[in-house]
Structures are given as C-alpha cells and as structure tokens.
Amino acid sequence: AHYQQVKLLEQDIIPDLSGDKKHETITANIASNADSLATWLIPAIGDVCHEYNLAVNFRLADENRTINYLKDGEVFGALSTHAQALPGCTLEKLGDMQYLLVASPGFISRYFPQGINVQALATAPAVAYDQKDDMHIKYIERIFGLKGGAYPCHTVRSSEAFVNFAKHGIAYCLIPKLQIQAELASGELINLLPEHTIVRALYWHHWVLLKGVFKAYSNAIILRAQHALSNQ
C-alpha cells in the first residue's frame, strides 16, 4: 500500500515540476458505492477535471466493502460506512444517506392493494444490486420477519436501474431519497414505509498524505457530499 502511495504521489509531483499540469495525465483511483456515484459523486470531480488532466478510475462495491480497496492500496480514497480510520489514513464524515422503500402506484395496486404485509411480500418482486447486497433482505426480515429467499428478487448491478425498475412497476426497492426526490414529489413513486427509513452514515477515507490533484479531489468530494447529504 505504501508503494502505491509513493507512485501516485510521484505522478502528481511531475506535472508541478514541469509546469504543465494541463497536459500531464494523472490517474486517480477511488472506491465508491454505486448510490454515491449515481447521485452526487460525479459533479464533485467536475471542477478538478477542468483544472487537471485527470483520468478517474472507480472501484465499485457495497459501502461496507469499499474500504478493502483502500486497505489493499488500490485506491487513495474510499467512500465507506466504516467509522474507524485505517493505519496511515484519515476520515471525514460526509453525512447520512437515507434509503426509502418505494414502489409505483401501479405496483402497489397490483401487489399491495391491502397494504404491505407478509402475505403480499411473498409474491411481490424486490431487487438487489448483487448476491452480496443484503440491505433489502435485512430490512424486510427486521420489519416483517420474512427471510431472504422467501420472495422473488431481481438482481441488477446499477443504481439507476433500481429507479427504473420501480418507476416501471417491475419491483419495489430501497432507493436513496437523494436519487428520487422528483419522483416522490410528483407521485410517480410512493414511500411504502415512511416510519422505517434507513439511515446510513457515510465517510470519506483517504491517505493522510495528500497533495496537488489528490488533495483537490478529496476536498471536492467532502464539500459536494456534505452539501448534497444535508439537503435530502
């Protein structure tokens, strides 16, 4: 991991020494959850990409597992739910991601005409990001006592697809409130269980020693995330 830090910091120093930061390509690797990438993360790097010739590589994983990329030295920063910093790293709390269980009016009429209950859930299709995504499973089990495998569940590795699955009446699912504010306001999507909102604290973990484009990138992520997550 230390070797990777040195190599990445070297490529940040070279453009400064040459005075040609606009033309030297700098590669920045970060680990992110799909929901952050689909909402606030891309705008966060816009100003940095305009200032530097930046090639960004995203390592996508569940927010519980992104920290492993930082631990292995594959990235200089990671968006994670872990509240404790790794050795040689520091962290900033960005805010809380709120997740709502939503469905379209048509889906509700078809599967939940008498409300959401165990009997209705047994036939209503849900959706998960991948086989390791257990947020929905834990949520339904905690509230209704229904275990994973006791109901149909689609799998799709795309946060944007979650929204489309819900809007087109294909599934009900947990989606970040930040991602569907317009759909909630218009009634295109309905919050099924307002009293059971999931709140997940999100942290930005990064190397302690950052300079140049990496420091600018880190600062942009912190500012954009804190602003977005405070306006849900």
Cite the ranges covered by each PLM segment.
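Alpha-helical "hinge/linker" immediately C-terminal to small N-terminal DNA-binding modules
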Residues: A1-K22
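Paired acidic/hydrophobic, glycine-rich loop segments that form the ligand-binding mouth/hinge
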Residues: F76-S80, A171-I175, L192
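A late-sequence structural motif
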Residues: W40, L192-Q232
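Beta->alpha turn/N-cap motifs
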Residues: D62-E63, S80-Q84, S104-P105, S158, ...
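C-terminal regulatory
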Residues: L91-Q98, V102-I170, A185-T197, Q226-Q232
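Immediate post-signal peptide segment of exported/extracytoplasmic ligand-binding proteins
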Residues: S18-A28, Q119-T123
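Central regulatory/effector-binding core of bacterial HTH transcription factors
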Residues: H23-P87
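Short, hydrophobic alpha-helical packing/hinge segments within bilobed ligand-binding/sensory domains
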Residues: R65-I67, A161-V163, I180
